[in-house]
Amino acid sequence: MLGRSTGVTILNILPPHDTGGFNYVQASACDVPFPDKSFELAFSNSAIEHVGSEENQFKFASEMMRVGKRIYCQTPSRLFPIDPHLSAPFLHWLPASWLTPQFLRYFTVNGWLWRKPYQYDVTWISKRKLQKMFPGCKITTERFLLMPKSFTVTN
Protein backbone atom coordinates (compact mmCIF):
# COMPACT_ATOMS: atom_id res chain seq x y z
CA MET A 1 0.00 0.00 0.00
CA LEU A 2 3.03 2.26 0.00
CA GLY A 3 2.64 5.04 -2.49
CA ARG A 4 -1.11 4.46 -2.83
CA SER A 5 -3.77 6.75 -1.52
CA THR A 6 -6.29 5.00 0.69
CA GLY A 7 -9.53 6.15 2.14
CA VAL A 8 -13.08 5.28 2.98
CA THR A 9 -16.03 6.72 1.10
CA ILE A 10 -19.43 6.46 2.76
CA LEU A 11 -22.50 6.51 0.53
CA ASN A 12 -25.84 7.19 2.19
CA ILE A 13 -29.19 8.50 1.03
CA LEU A 14 -29.46 10.56 4.23
CA PRO A 15 -27.58 13.84 4.72
CA PRO A 16 -24.39 13.58 6.78
CA HIS A 17 -24.49 14.45 10.46
CA ASP A 18 -20.87 13.60 11.27
CA THR A 19 -18.52 12.31 8.60
CA GLY A 20 -15.84 11.34 11.11
CA GLY A 21 -13.18 12.43 8.64
CA PHE A 22 -14.40 10.02 5.94
CA ASN A 23 -15.42 11.00 2.42
CA TYR A 24 -19.22 11.25 2.41
CA VAL A 25 -21.46 11.15 -0.65
CA GLN A 26 -25.21 11.62 -0.36
CA ALA A 27 -26.77 9.46 -3.07
CA SER A 28 -28.87 6.36 -3.65
CA ALA A 29 -27.07 3.01 -3.54
CA CYS A 30 -29.29 2.05 -6.49
CA ASP A 31 -27.62 4.72 -8.67
CA VAL A 32 -24.03 5.23 -7.50
CA PRO A 33 -22.25 8.31 -8.93
CA PHE A 34 -18.87 6.63 -9.52
CA PRO A 35 -17.20 5.03 -12.54
CA ASP A 36 -16.86 1.26 -12.91
CA LYS A 37 -14.43 -0.46 -10.51
CA SER A 38 -13.75 2.80 -8.62
CA PHE A 39 -13.25 1.00 -5.31
CA GLU A 40 -11.10 -1.88 -4.13
CA LEU A 41 -14.03 -3.02 -1.97
CA ALA A 42 -17.74 -2.20 -2.06
CA PHE A 43 -19.02 -3.04 1.44
CA SER A 44 -22.60 -3.22 2.68
CA ASN A 45 -23.77 -4.54 6.04
CA SER A 46 -27.51 -5.03 6.53
CA ALA A 47 -28.55 -2.32 4.07
CA ILE A 48 -29.82 -4.08 0.93
CA GLU A 49 -33.02 -5.18 2.68
CA HIS A 50 -33.88 -1.48 3.30
CA VAL A 51 -33.84 -0.16 -0.29
CA GLY A 52 -37.50 -0.98 -0.91
CA SER A 53 -38.70 -3.02 -3.86
CA GLU A 54 -37.12 -6.13 -5.34
CA GLU A 55 -36.25 -4.01 -8.39
CA ASN A 56 -34.28 -1.63 -6.16
CA GLN A 57 -32.54 -4.56 -4.50
CA PHE A 58 -31.38 -5.82 -7.90
CA LYS A 59 -30.17 -2.28 -8.77
CA PHE A 60 -28.30 -2.11 -5.44
CA ALA A 61 -26.58 -5.44 -6.16
CA SER A 62 -25.74 -4.42 -9.72
CA GLU A 63 -24.21 -1.13 -8.55
CA MET A 64 -22.11 -2.90 -5.91
CA MET A 65 -20.68 -5.25 -8.53
CA ARG A 66 -20.15 -2.37 -10.97
CA VAL A 67 -18.21 0.02 -8.70
CA GLY A 68 -16.35 -2.52 -6.54
CA LYS A 69 -13.44 -4.67 -7.63
CA ARG A 70 -14.41 -6.87 -4.69
CA ILE A 71 -17.73 -6.94 -2.82
CA TYR A 72 -18.95 -7.83 0.63
CA CYS A 73 -22.71 -7.66 1.15
CA GLN A 74 -24.40 -9.02 4.27
CA THR A 75 -28.12 -9.30 4.97
CA PRO A 76 -30.04 -10.99 7.80
CA SER A 77 -32.03 -14.16 7.18
CA ARG A 78 -35.80 -14.08 7.63
CA LEU A 79 -35.58 -17.74 8.69
CA PHE A 80 -33.82 -16.82 11.94
CA PRO A 81 -36.38 -16.52 14.76
CA ILE A 82 -35.12 -13.17 16.07
CA ASP A 83 -35.47 -10.15 13.81
CA PRO A 84 -32.42 -7.89 14.26
CA HIS A 85 -34.44 -4.85 13.17
CA LEU A 86 -37.12 -5.34 15.84
CA SER A 87 -35.00 -7.07 18.50
CA ALA A 88 -37.86 -9.48 19.04
CA PRO A 89 -38.60 -13.11 18.24
CA PHE A 90 -41.10 -14.25 15.60
CA LEU A 91 -42.71 -10.85 14.85
CA HIS A 92 -41.14 -10.64 11.38
CA TRP A 93 -43.04 -13.82 10.49
CA LEU A 94 -46.37 -12.00 11.00
CA PRO A 95 -48.13 -10.18 8.16
CA ALA A 96 -46.46 -6.83 7.44
CA SER A 97 -49.76 -5.02 8.01
CA TRP A 98 -49.59 -6.00 11.69
CA LEU A 99 -46.21 -4.34 12.24
CA THR A 100 -47.56 -0.90 13.03
CA PRO A 101 -45.75 1.43 15.45
CA GLN A 102 -48.57 0.90 17.97
CA PHE A 103 -48.20 -2.90 17.80
CA LEU A 104 -44.41 -2.82 17.95
CA ARG A 105 -44.52 -0.48 20.93
CA TYR A 106 -45.86 -3.26 23.14
CA PHE A 107 -44.27 -6.36 21.62
CA THR A 108 -40.62 -5.47 21.06
CA VAL A 109 -37.73 -4.67 23.37
CA ASN A 110 -36.92 -1.55 21.37
CA GLY A 111 -40.58 -0.57 21.06
CA TRP A 112 -40.34 1.40 24.26
CA LEU A 113 -37.79 3.63 22.57
CA TRP A 114 -38.46 6.02 19.71
CA ARG A 115 -37.83 4.22 16.41
CA LYS A 116 -37.07 5.78 13.05
CA PRO A 117 -39.69 4.97 10.38
CA TYR A 118 -37.23 3.42 7.90
CA GLN A 119 -36.50 0.63 10.38
CA TYR A 120 -39.97 -0.82 9.66
CA ASP A 121 -39.37 -0.95 5.92
CA VAL A 122 -37.64 -4.30 5.44
CA THR A 123 -37.85 -6.43 2.30
CA TRP A 124 -36.29 -9.76 3.23
CA ILE A 125 -34.02 -11.53 0.73
CA SER A 126 -33.68 -15.30 0.45
CA LYS A 127 -30.41 -17.04 -0.36
CA ARG A 128 -31.87 -18.11 -3.70
CA LYS A 129 -32.72 -14.50 -4.58
CA LEU A 130 -29.22 -13.36 -3.56
CA GLN A 131 -27.79 -15.90 -6.00
CA LYS A 132 -29.82 -14.25 -8.78
CA MET A 133 -28.84 -10.73 -7.67
CA PHE A 134 -25.13 -11.51 -7.44
CA PRO A 135 -24.35 -13.99 -10.25
CA GLY A 136 -20.96 -15.64 -9.95
CA CYS A 137 -20.49 -14.62 -6.32
CA LYS A 138 -20.07 -16.82 -3.27
CA ILE A 139 -22.92 -16.81 -0.74
CA THR A 140 -22.09 -17.93 2.79
CA THR A 141 -24.71 -18.72 5.42
CA GLU A 142 -23.91 -17.65 8.97
CA ARG A 143 -25.61 -20.02 11.40
CA PHE A 144 -26.44 -19.92 15.09
CA LEU A 145 -27.61 -23.18 16.68
CA LEU A 146 -27.93 -24.59 13.13
CA MET A 147 -30.40 -21.85 12.11
CA PRO A 148 -29.50 -19.47 9.24
CA LYS A 149 -28.82 -16.09 10.87
CA SER A 150 -27.52 -14.12 7.88
CA PHE A 151 -26.16 -14.38 4.36
CA THR A 152 -22.89 -12.89 3.14
CA VAL A 153 -22.08 -12.32 -0.52
CA THR A 154 -18.43 -12.07 -1.63
CA ASN A 155 -16.48 -12.32 -4.85
Regions found by a protein language model. Name each.
Residues M1-F80, N155:
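Conserved SAM-binding loop
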Residues R70-P101:
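Conserved class I S-adenosyl-L-methionine
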Residues L86-P89, L104-Y118:
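Short, glycine-/aromatic-enriched active-site segment of Class I SAM-dependent methyltransferases
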Residues W114-K138:
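Short alpha-helix
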Residues V122, L146-T152:
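Short hydrophobic/aromatic beta-strand or adjacent loop that forms the aromatic wall/cage
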Residues G136-M147:
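Conserved S-adenosyl-L-methionine
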